[in-house]
Amino acid sequence: MVGRIYHVVLTVSDLDRSIAFYRDILGLEFQGEIFMEGEETDKMFRKENCKARVAYLNGSKALEAPPVELIQFVDSKIHKEQSDLFTTSISEVCLYTDDIDSVYKKLIENHVECLSEPQYFDFGADGFGESRAFYFRDPDGIILEMMQPL
């Protein structure tokens, strides 16, 4: 049976740039990097001579908090398509904060594309409570959400 989400994977075009963004701008802790290659990797990704750099970052020490896994395929053409909230796929990854205004300010100061300012939502009547949230893009254009439960 499925127990929980173990990690969330984002394919990136430049692993070093993405590590810097998620670590230095978003404040996630760099946990380490691995290099994948060999027969198992080829089978897993269904690509001959597949090689990948993989980095793990997390903002929480809690076991239930899945890490963000960034993967850059080496010597492979990346099919870059702009993330879109209205396309069938994983539309965004939501990150937690306890100070959404300071995160938003830091993103703006670092010229990160934010799709809006933080917005207030009240879903208390539906059992989900109140929050503030906004969407923004990482260096590859992947849509992320920042949320602060209230």
For the regions a protein language model found, what residue spans apply to each?
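A short, acidic/glycine-rich surface segment
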Residues: G38-K43, S76-E81, F121-G127
